[in-house]
């Protein structure tokens, strides 16, 4: 990967981790102060706003990244495309607010707490004006990360300062909204320095041309959104609330790990879109090959670690009462590898090529398999069955997308480098397995296992002269000498 891609990846990774840490730090405090009733009310209203946001966004954020990245070297065209997409998003947001008002004045449960509902709806406006997609498309990750992390730090301080008792629900909602989209107002103000709307007339704008392709992304988003909630919903109907709780504990840990792994995708999408639109196919293939190998390099030990350390991890993060989550975590952990591969081939290869119809087919296949597996496995195996269903469905999606994307790839997916990662992971597994038999606290067991496992895995890759291990080692030596 080029230097700028490495830097962008690190910055995006920092941004992703900060997004994961904010709720981990603030939620335990907020839940004790506001109690289940206050937290539940905010979450309920926020989930409704979330669905309205999904509809009003119409797939624009993901679509806009690709379209702006294509023309980012042409200042006039970049300005025009950005203005068109921003205008379209604002129009859709206007209709979204009409829906917000209708719901607020017709649904009794929401009408009783309109200030809270309207406060949370601020995310609709800030998301439209925030043009987060523009900064991703132009790869301005330094600005994105500094703003996002700063806002989250301020929001965390504000939450601990202002949320003092169970009546501070509005403060909690406002702070959470600001932590999520508060930096968007700065994005909008800064946009004036990045584009020039005087280069074209209003009559030249053609927002209609963006509707059809954005609708395709909206369809994809809807399928993915349904698929993500499917296990929990079906488990809730077919089994108990406790089963949902056990599944959620395992699922959240896996999704957090997956978010760290897939943070590279946010960096690669604009770069790949630009390479394809400008005809730099050789650069595209070279970067894609290296990025895929990096994904496998990280995903394999991550999956192995979660499977082997499921017991102490659940013990630390959820407590001993969540013991049934241990086999659930072990069953669902493989999706890190499966989703990593399928997501890379779908969103970093097929989507930049304009093959979103194929991506929709892959997502649909995954969802159908998930439904079938859930119907078969949940009645007998409860939350473990739901976890197995997730892994099987994501495996099927990975197989389908490998088959579909294969004809467009100019690099080998599986080679000797991947074999080294498998062998290195196997050696790491042996070491971690023996450490796991130690008689010590869960936290110590996790820390020692992760440290020793990482060292063993890294040393093996260094001995085999792996590109990433050698690069990381040279960077470490350079920093150490400096």
Language-model segments: which ranges?
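N-terminal membrane topogenesis motif
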Residues: 1-24, 76-79, 191, 204-220, ...
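Helix-loop junctions and terminal segments of transmembrane helices
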Residues: 28, 57-73, 250, 254-299, ...
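Membrane-interface junctions at transmembrane-helix termini in multi-pass inner-membrane proteins
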Residues: 114, 124-148, 334-365
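Hydrophobic alpha-helical transmembrane segments
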Residues: 114, 121, 145-193, 213, ...
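Interhelical loop/hinge segments that connect adjacent transmembrane helices in multipass membrane
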Residues: 1, 169-173, 185-228, 267, ...
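Signature of the first transmembrane helix
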Residues: 4-62, 97, 101, 156, ...
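Membrane-proximal transmembrane or re-entrant/amphipathic helices at the cytosolic face
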Residues: 433-482
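Interfacial segments at transmembrane-helix termini and the short loops linking adjacent helices
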Residues: 104-120, 306-338
